[in-house]
Amino acid sequence: MTPTSYLATLARLGWTPAGLARQLGRSGNTVANWTRPGYRVPDDVAAWLERRLDAHDRWMRDDPPPSP
């Protein structure tokens, strides 16, 4: 997962790096580093985020918000 796709995934989920750090029990600096060149999101975290995004997309498709 690239820094760009990592940030895009968090944005689609409505999450921040700080919030993700709390959920994962990791330091804010560690999670923030994943947005920088030369760092990478660990494979297990990337897979978990992709599963969360898939679940979110299914949920939004199957139960969309009410129309205005």
Residue ranges of model-derived segments:
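Generic structural marker for isolated residues within well-ordered, non-membrane alpha-helices
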Residues: 6, 17, 46
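Residues in the recognition helix of alpha-helical DNA-binding motifs
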Residues: 9, 23, 34
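A short, Lys/Arg-rich alpha-helix, primarily the initiator
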Residues: 1-13, 50, 59-60
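DNA major-groove recognition helix of helix-turn-helix/homeodomain DNA-binding modules
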Residues: 43-62
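Short alpha-helical "recognition helix" segments of helix-turn-helix
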Residues: 19-21
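Charged low-complexity stretches with an acidic bias
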Residues: 64-68
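Recognition helix of helix-turn-helix/homeodomain-like DNA-binding domains
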Residues: 26-41
